[in-house]
């Protein structure tokens, strides 16, 4: 649930989602769920010439299992806080 909480803080920011089929899609993150499925609005495909069928698409739902990476501006990430949260989450999971 750690990364679910992290991605919830990125709502209404611009992200680039790289899919397992090598397509990269840039858009505004509108929602995320516990399976890390994401909804993007105002999308654009990074290499539009390779994926012309995506030119007319403006809003997109992406299943979490097809996501390889999510890129965002480093201004949105407090790496020290995130590393600390990961350590606490790991410690809590070991106790259970």
From Swiss-Prot:
The keyword Ribonucleoprotein applies. It is found in: Nucleus; Cytoplasm. The keyword Heme does not apply. GO terms for cellular component: catalytic step 2 spliceosome; Lsm1-7-Pat1 complex; Lsm2-8 complex; nucleolus; P-body; precatalytic spliceosome; telomerase holoenzyme complex; U2 snRNP. Keywords: Cytoplasm, mRNA processing, mRNA splicing, Nucleus, Ribonucleoprotein, RNA-binding, Spliceosome. InterPro entries: LSM_dom_sf, Sm, Sm_dom_euk/arc, U6_snRNA_Lsm2. Component of LSm protein complexes, which are involved in RNA processing and may function in a chaperone-like manner. Component of the cytoplasmic LSM1-LSM7 complex which is involved in mRNA degradation by activating the decapping step. The LSM1-LSM7 complex loads onto the 3'-end of single stranded RNA. Component of the nuclear LSM2-LSM8 complex, which is involved in spliceosome assembly. The LSM2-LSM8 complex plays a role in the biogenesis of the spliceosomal U4/U6-U5 tri-snRNP complex by accelerating prp24-mediated annealing of U4/U6 di-snRNA. This is LSM complex subunit lsm2. It comes from Schizosaccharomyces pombe (strain 972 / ATCC 24843) (Fission yeast).
């Amino acid at each position: 649930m750690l990364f679910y909480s992290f991605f919830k803080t990125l709502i209404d920011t611009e992200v680039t989602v790289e899919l397992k089929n090598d397509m990269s899609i840039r858009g505004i993150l509108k929602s995320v769920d516990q399976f890390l499925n994401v909804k993007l609005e105002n999308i654009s495909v990074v290499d539009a010439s390779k994926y012309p069928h995506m030119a007319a698409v403006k809003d997109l739902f992406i299943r979490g299992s097809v996501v390889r990476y999510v890129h965002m501006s480093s201004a949105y990430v407090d790496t020290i806080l995130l590393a600390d949260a990961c350590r606490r989450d790991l410690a809590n999971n070991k106790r259970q």
